[in-house]
Structure formats: C-alpha cells, structure tokens
Amino acid sequence: MMTASLAGCIGQEEEEEASDWLFIGDSDIEGWDTAQFMNSTNIGDGGSMCSDTLSTIDEVLEEYNPIHVVIVCGENDLSEERTVEETFEDFQAIINKIIESGALVTYMGTKPEPETTELHAQYRDYDSSIQDFAINLATDSSAPLNVVDVYQGFEDIGNPDSLYQEDQLHLSLEGYDYWDQWLVQVSNDSECIIWQSQQCRITIE
C-alpha cells in the first residue's frame, strides 16, 4: 500500500504520479480541504450518491489515473430511501473498478450526525457490509480497500456537536481535523484493513 504522512505529503520532491490522491464522493468530500495531500484532486459534489459516482467512475479513473482514491458515498443514497443492499451494490461496483485500475482505496465511513438519527441503524449496516467486503478483498500481503470507521471513532470521543456545522449534518473544521489525522494514520499502516480512532482494529492476518 502507498504510505503517506502529512509531512510527507507536503513539499516532497516526488514525481506527480507517485503521490496522486483523488477524493471522490459527496459534500463531505467537497467540503474537505485536501490540498495538504500532495498532487491531490478533489472532485466531491454535494448531494452526490453512490449511483452518481458509479455512473462516472470509468471516465474519472481514465482522466486522473490516481494512485490512491479516497471515497465517501452512501449517506445520501440512504436518505433518499435506497436500501442498504442497493447502496452497497453500487459501492462494491465502484470499488471493484478502482482496484482493477491499480489504485488503492480508503473509505471514510458514515457519521453519527445528530440530524439523521433515524438513519443511523442503516448507516451501521451499510458500513458493516463495507467492512466485511474490505476484509474479503485483503490478501496475505495487501489491503486494497481500507475503511476508516468514522461513526465509531466519533462515538469514542463522545460525538460532540462541535464535530459538525450548525446544521448538525456537515462536518466542521474540528471534524475534518480528525479525518485528516485518521487518513494519514491509516495510509501509513500497510497492513491495516479497518481503522478506528487512533489505532488499527483489523489487520492483514
């Protein structure tokens, strides 16, 4: 797995192709200042669903040829009354296409947003399906998909309102600070499959 540290992502004299990060998905990606990741491209689109990402992923991969893709999608699908199974099916198809292109993938999981408590059970079921998928994809030597368990990570620190904007839905700067830390940490652990808070919860066996 490609490794990265925040220091290593800033100012290193490396070829662009060797440090190419692509951030795709919904408003959580769109609102994330990802410039600290060297040669990164952020094409997040507010309101985007997994079904939207799937419809464009072939063209996106051809255009950007990323080394590492960071994806957020699913919450909007579930809020539009798509089922967990339908949403996961689209997610799985996206990930398979990314892996086939040769890129690694990190999924930033759903959030325990105060505004969407009626969806939280579905969020957890969805994330559980993705975590199982990531475990099944892993081999003895690599984890092509790793998952940051954002939901449980936020719960571990009490899920304070300060993690969110006033709408209690979108992330605040404090919330994104945790995302920055967790993405750097999981990217630096080549054997990690599931990351939670400050440690790897499931690794390659």
Pin down the residues of each PLM region.
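Conserved SGNH/GDSL esterase-like catalytic core that processes O-acyl groups on lipids
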Residues: 16-93, 114-116, 121
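Catalytic His-Asp segment of secreted/periplasmic serine-dependent ester chemistry enzymes
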Residues: 114-205
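Glycine-rich phosphate-binding loop signature in dinucleotide/nucleotide-binding domains
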Residues: 62-65, 101, 190
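A short helix->loop->beta-strand "cap" motif at the edges of active sites that frequently abuts
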Residues: 100-104, 143
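Secretory targeting signatures
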Residues: 1-16
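Catalytic-core regions built around general acid/base machinery
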Residues: 93-101
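Carbohydrate-associated surface elements
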Residues: 111
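N-terminal low-complexity, Pro/Thr/Ser-rich intrinsically disordered segments
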Residues: 14-22, 200-205
